[in-house]
Amino acid sequence: MTWLNRDVISSLDFTRDDLMQLFYEAKEMENYAKSKLNILDGKIMATAFFEPSTRTRLSFETAMLRLGGRVLGFGSVEASSVAKGESLGDTIRMLDSYSDIIVIRHSLEGAAKYAADIATVPVINAGDGTQNHPTQAMLDAYTIWREYGRLDDLTIGILGDLRYARVVTSLVQLLSNFKVKLRLISPEILRPRRELVDFMRMRGMNYSLHSNLNEVLSELDVLYVVRIQRERFPDPVEYERVKGSFKVTPESLIGAKDTLIILHPLPRVDEVDHRLDSTRYARYFRQSALGVPLRMALLKLVLKGD
């Protein structure tokens, strides 16, 4: 399927071929991530961020500006007419009339699909509900591909909140297009939702569930860490106990492969020790930086085509 005028709502909407085309385009865009092109001159991107965002919003805006386009929109509900009671539908209709593409983040699951059903321009989901963040998953997979030159035949560990972190669902769905082994590590209370486990089983994915990083550390090529969210725990004492056991430190990586890379969608709190920032394992800052060329490629493909 062509990328031109395509909505980007869910990781499930994209094939392996789609993703590889995006990755090669993003690799080319790395050459221009600090310069300006005129590919999207005259195009306007509207950002509708009903939830706070730093990296996702700014990388989309930077990508559009680097491509020669312009940006309008808002970064919080308070900065929009939603604060006055305007409906999501009316907001989308207004942005649709002003722009060539809409990038939306919302707390409600299905908000991006709802926006796409209303809008006449393409809509990109920058995160909605607790289960969808397709462009973050694209960035994560792209970072792994840039590091290893492939996604097939890698063992990827995902550590932390596997139940509520929306990027986890999107990343697993996206990785189902490749021959990977998944090792999912979390406290019992934050195990993946049944729907995600059923999806992995249906797709015939090689996966296993674990409660301790040590069980799988030596086989990992990638360790993807997501924040454990305090607000999900009814008992603060239980949170403190669990949080401490899922912190990645130099000491906890004894026995890891020399080639292991650590990724994190950011922001981090204390789940990845800052002492790791200068080690050979750390790739999370490069991962964040690659968000600009990845989203440049995405915008170019959707607005200009192959």
UniProtKB/Swiss-Prot annotation:
The keyword Iron-sulfur does not apply. It comes from the Archaea. It is an enzyme of class 2 (transferase). GO terms for molecular function: amino acid binding; aspartate carbamoyltransferase activity. PROSITE patterns: CARBAMOYLTRANSFERASE. Carbamoyl phosphate binds at R55, T56, R105, H133, Q136, L266, P267. GO terms for biological process: 'de novo' pyrimidine nucleobase biosynthetic process; 'de novo' UMP biosynthetic process; amino acid metabolic process. Pathway: Pyrimidine metabolism; UMP biosynthesis via de novo pathway; (S)-dihydroorotate from bicarbonate: step 2/3. Its EC number is 2.1.3.2. L-aspartate binds at K84, R166, R227. It catalyses: carbamoyl phosphate + L-aspartate = N-carbamoyl-L-aspartate + phosphate + H(+). Keywords: Pyrimidine biosynthesis, Transferase. SUPFAM superfamilies: Aspartate/ornithine carbamoyltransferase (SSF53671). It holds the Pfam family OTCace_N. Heterooligomer of catalytic and regulatory chains. Belongs to the aspartate/ornithine carbamoyltransferase superfamily. ATCase family. Catalyzes the condensation of carbamoyl phosphate and aspartate to form carbamoyl aspartate and inorganic phosphate, the committed step in the de novo pyrimidine nucleotide biosynthesis pathway. This is Aspartate carbamoyltransferase catalytic subunit. The lineage of its organism: Archaea, Thermoproteota, Thermoprotei, Thermoproteales, Thermoproteaceae.
